[in-house]
């Protein structure tokens, strides 16, 4: 089954590029034609690139990796947060802080600070041992950290790959990822530079429906990778490494486990009659051997004839 269909891409407006005066000549090979001053992206190429990106993301997650979702423009914020949360991956949908990847050790300290602030009960002034003014200052600090770092609060290390919506707007994130040799998977509009992206998806990065569709496809790849990772861990008898599964993934795997347990007793019952039938002929075998034991009695007359 195809990851996404041509019809879905068309209905979501993935084929619409930028105006002809706002383009990057390096994107020429991905452009199908031009209509009313707007470039039309070749969706046949987009489909093949989507499949390639899907397989890469799935394999990365299956081997214990994480994928960071990045999209701070208004059209992408909701889709990025929703899809990343669905599959339990880190995301940035507000402002990209410089050094989020290249200076992660410092960012990690701020994440620890956020967790400390989350332990404070701002409603109970007496129990906190702080004045109202001090609590107000801390609550503002917490709100600021939640806004900028809330999406990556569970991240322990730099991601294995990043999914980016609009590489021109997120050029700092792209630069940091390339500096650390982290693979970049991104939507490429007609004004982007394809050389900056490892796994490119030619498409519209401005329309909400287009961004939502492509982000959902990447999230589906992550979900499939999580299931594969969990299956491999069960086969080895070890818990799979990396980020924990999302709740819906755990429910799915537990359902499969219960179904397997229900089938096991039925298979055991079916084997018992077969074993009994196989043992019955074996029990009768000694009776068939009885005539052989009587053979010496038949030879007795021959011995009497010799004596006569």
Curated annotation (Swiss-Prot):
GO terms for cellular component: cytosolic small ribosomal subunit. GO terms for biological process: translation. Keywords: Ribonucleoprotein, Ribosomal protein. Coiled coil: none annotated. GO terms for molecular function: structural constituent of ribosome. It holds the Pfam family Ribosomal_S2. Residues 250-261 have a biased composition (Basic and acidic residues). Residues 250-308 are annotated as: Disordered. Residues 275-308 have a biased composition (Low complexity). InterPro entries: Ribosomal_uS2, Ribosomal_uS2_bac/mit/plastid, Ribosomal_uS2_CS, Ribosomal_uS2_flav_dom_sf. Belongs to the universal ribosomal protein uS2 family. This is Small ribosomal subunit protein uS2. It comes from Streptomyces avermitilis (strain ATCC 31267 / DSM 46492 / JCM 5070 / NBRC 14893 / NCIMB 12804 / NRRL 8165 / MA-4680). The gene is rpsB.
